[in-house]
Swiss-Prot record:
<keyword id="KW-0131">Cell cycle</keyword>
<dbReference type="GO" id="GO:0004864">
    <property type="term" value="F:protein phosphatase inhibitor activity"/>
</dbReference>
<feature type="compositionally biased region" description="Polar residues">
    <location>
        <begin position="152"/>
        <end position="164"/>
    </location>
</feature>
<feature type="compositionally biased region" description="Low complexity">
    <location>
        <begin position="384"/>
        <end position="395"/>
    </location>
</feature>
<dbReference type="GO" id="GO:1990143">
    <property type="term" value="C:CoA-synthesizing protein complex"/>
</dbReference>
<feature type="compositionally biased region" description="Basic and acidic residues">
    <location>
        <begin position="661"/>
        <end position="674"/>
    </location>
</feature>
<feature type="compositionally biased region" description="Polar residues">
    <location>
        <begin position="15"/>
        <end position="81"/>
    </location>
</feature>
<feature type="compositionally biased region" description="Acidic residues">
    <location>
        <begin position="580"/>
        <end position="591"/>
    </location>
</feature>
<feature type="compositionally biased region" description="Basic and acidic residues">
    <location>
        <begin position="198"/>
        <end position="212"/>
    </location>
</feature>
<feature type="compositionally biased region" description="Polar residues">
    <location>
        <begin position="351"/>
        <end position="368"/>
    </location>
</feature>
<keyword id="KW-0597">Phosphoprotein</keyword>
<feature type="region of interest" description="Disordered">
    <location>
        <begin position="575"/>
        <end position="674"/>
    </location>
</feature>
<dbReference type="InterPro" id="IPR036551">
    <property type="entry name" value="Flavin_trans-like"/>
</dbReference>
<dbReference type="GO" id="GO:0042802">
    <property type="term" value="F:identical protein binding"/>
</dbReference>
<feature type="compositionally biased region" description="Low complexity">
    <location>
        <begin position="214"/>
        <end position="230"/>
    </location>
</feature>
<feature type="compositionally biased region" description="Polar residues">
    <location>
        <begin position="403"/>
        <end position="426"/>
    </location>
</feature>
<feature type="region of interest" description="Disordered">
    <location>
        <begin position="348"/>
        <end position="368"/>
    </location>
</feature>
Length: 674
């Protein structure tokens, strides 16, 4: 980028405060320029008497060089910085001893700038040192126009743009290593010339690659907004490479940049180890089981006992392999279940006590003894079962403690389930009259599941698990909490954190006066206007309370609630429709078979009739033939018979004649005797 800086020839000279009085006098003296320059390296001379270069063109001066008395080193002042940079003079030092070594190195730099047109020129002015040539005129001040691509050991080139070669820069350690390998020490680094034509990153005040001014990675807050002093040319938030920076000299150093100094450009903060991160998932709430997830919420009302019927109906419609149902119970709802369970247990205990009393009163009776033995056996079994249950709970608690001490996580996350049946002794919940496979939750479970920061939060997991939430029954207390946004229990916490893309059904159940209250209407209006994902069912008319009051405040019929749930979930499953179609097809096939059977039977009957007719015809023909034959035979027989009869008649006639003659003779003889 030296060609851009060389075009600005209208720059003024060095400020007067940077030069001594003698130097200003020498500059002010009038003299003609000398044109005896022999080459680009003519200014390099011995240590005692430095040779002043001659100028080859009368162009204006841009850079002025000052040599000290010893001639071992000089100071070069540049007053023509890159456009856009602050005009602050920069002083660098050079050593002529290293000129030849640097010239050899700089002949083949890794990032050599292409040769530019010879029409663009750069000027350098070398002024004689103070005390060596005090009386020298301006004609002794020689200028030189170097050819493009040539390097001078004692001149300072205008700094190249720090934004043009950002992708070719290295970090500070690689630059230091390169300098050390070329020059052989840190002293030569400080005295080396930074004016080579190689496109290295340079800045008037400091190294551009200084990590204190160019942080190489994103901040720990993951912010992509750069500081005002940092110019970033890339917009890729993932791969942020090193870029040149334009920084103020007075800007304070950031501790964040210092801490990020040793990190690579693409480095990422160390994440937590995977084995130490517990998956935010409760095993009792599987989300990828391919089932419909229905979450019921029950509050303290007498209609809470209809929950069992709704669960059974849904399972009958979908089947247990297609639907999964879980229940959230408030403290009031658990009290209703607990009171009912206690009544049942009290009746059982009373029956056992009465049986004991009867057995004791009828100790001599054999039947009484049998009852006593049976009751005693039952009592002993219950006692042993309670003892075994207590031992099992103790063992379970010990195992939980061991697991928590070894793994650091509660055992509830390891797959243990809390059921509503009495067989699970680990459960500390009151006995709930729900199916044994139904998982129910109470407020205490919120704290039993959560032990540390990485454990799942129950109401968040329930919100993620459920496809629909049905609060049935809904009391006025919970209604007010929902409308006002309170979340002081598990159910209201789930509703407060609910995803609006999933539906919520509310089935109110309260007294007539409570339902007709102004606050109740206000709460319903808030829910209707502000919560479009919530549907409030119309209550049913029924007798409320022991006083026989009839009001429109009872919970909707359980079958209607189930129907609305099924419709919201997409309608009745295709399995039942397929079964109905199969049944229709079976019925059609049976009808066809029946028709075919009846048609075959008719055809068989027709065939049989035809066969019978044919047989009859044949029989008739045969009969006719037989009859004819018989007739012929009969005729013959008749003829024969007639002949025989005739013969017989003749014989008979002859016999009769003989008899008549005999009689006559007898008569004659009798008469004669008489």
């Amino acid at each position: 980028m030296t060609n851009k800086s060389s075009l600005k020839n209208n720059r003024k000279g060095v400020a007067s405060n940077t030069l001594s009085g003698a130097e200003q006098a020498n500059i002010g003296s009038s003299a003609m320029p000398d044109t005896n320059s022999t080459g680009p390296f003519s200014s390099v001379s011995s240590l005692d008497t430095p040779v002043v270069r001659k100028s080859t063109s009368p162009t204006g001066s841009q850079t002025k060089s000052i040599m000290n008395a010893s001639g071992t080193s000089g100071a070069v002042v540049s007053n023509t910085p890159e456009p856009g940079l602050k005009r602050i003079p920069t002083v660098t030092f050079s050593d002529p001893k290293l000129g030849s070594l640097r010239s050899d190195v700089e002949q083949t730099p890794p990032n050599q700038v292409a040769r530019q047109s010879s029409e663009k020129k750069a000027t350098s002015v070398h002024i004689a040192a103070e005390g060596a040539n005090q009386g020298r005129n301006l004609k002794d001040i020689n200028t030189k126009v170097p050819k493009d691509g040539e390097a001078s050991a004692s001149s300072f080139s205008t700094p190249t743009s720090i934004l043009s070669n950002a992708d070719m820069g290295n970090n500070i350690s690689s630059l230091l290593a390169k300098k050390l390998s070329f020059t052989g020490g840190t002293d030569s680094i400080l005295n080396s010339d930074n004016s080579s034509d190689s496109p290295r990153k340079e800045h008037p005040h400091f190294y551009v690659e200084d990590p204190l001014h160019t942080p190489s990675v994103r901040s720990r807050s993951n912010s992509t907004s750069p500081r005002p002093s940092v110019v970033v040319n890339t917009f890729n938030p993932i791969n942020i490479e090193r870029e040149g920076s334009i920084s103020k000299t007075g800007e304070p150093t950031l501790l964040e940049s210092v801490l990020e100094e040793a990190m690579s450009p693409n480095a990422v903060s160390n994440p937590l180890k995977r084995e130490n991160i517990m998956t935010n998932m409760d095993p009792r709430l599987p989300q990828d089981d391919g089932k419909l997830h229905v979450l019921f919420g029950a509050t303290g009302s007498l209609s809470v006992f209809k929950l069992k019927h709704m669960i059974r109906k849904l399972e009958e419609i979908y089947g247990r392999d297609k639907i999964c149902i879980q229940v959230i119970l408030t403290n009031s709802a658990t009290k209703f279940f607990a009171m009912k369970y206690m009544r049942k247990n009290k009746k059982q205990h009373n029956s056992i006590d009465t049986s004991f009393n009867s057995t004791n009163s009828n100790a001599g009776n054999i039947t009484g003894n049998k009852k006593k033995v049976a009751s005693l056996e039952k009592f002993s079994i219950q006692k042993t079962s309670s003892n075994s249950a207590a031992s099992q709970t103790n063992n379970k608690q010990e195992e939980e403690k061991q697991m928590a001490s070894t793994t650091g996580f509660p055992s509830t996350l390891g797959g243990s389930r809390t059921y509503s049946n009495s067989s699970n002794v680990v459960s500390q919940h009151p006995q709930i009259e729900l199916p044994a496979h139904i998982q129910f939750w109470t407020d205490q479970d919120e704290w039993d599941v959560w032990r540390q920061r990485t454990d799942p939060v129950l109401h968040i997991e329930l919100r993620r698990w459920a496809d629909i939430l049905v609060v049935a029954p809904l009391t006025a207390n919970t209604l007010a909490k929902i409308a006002l946004g309170l979340c002081d229990n598990l159910l209201t916490s789930v509703i407060r954190a609910w995803n609006p893309t999933f539906p919520i059904f509310l089935a109110p159940s309260m007294g007539s006066g409570t339902f007709n209250s102004i606050m109740t209407k206000k709460h319903f209006r808030i829910i209707q206007e502000e919560m479009p994902w919530v549907t409030v069912f119309k209550p049913s008319e029924k007798v409320m309370g022991i006083n026989g009051d009839i009001g429109l405040s009872g919970m909707m019929d359980a079958n209607e609630i189930v129907g609305k749930i099924v419709v919201k979930l997409g309608g009745y499953p295709d399995v039942s429709a397929g079964k109905e179609e199969e049944e229709d097809e079976d019925n059609d096939e049976e009808d066809d078979n029946k028709k075919n059977d009846t048609g075959g039977k008719d055809e068989d009957n027709d065939d049989d009739d035809d066969d019978d007719d044919d047989d009859d015809d044949d029989d008739d023909d045969d009969d006719d033939d037989d009859d004819d034959d018989d007739d012929d035979d009969d005729d013959d027989d008749d003829d024969d018979d007639d002949d025989d009869d005739d013969d017989d008649d003749d014989e008979d006639d002859e016999d009769e004649d003989e008899d008549d003659e005999g009689k006559k003779k007898e008569d004659k003889g009798g008469l004669q005797r008489s």
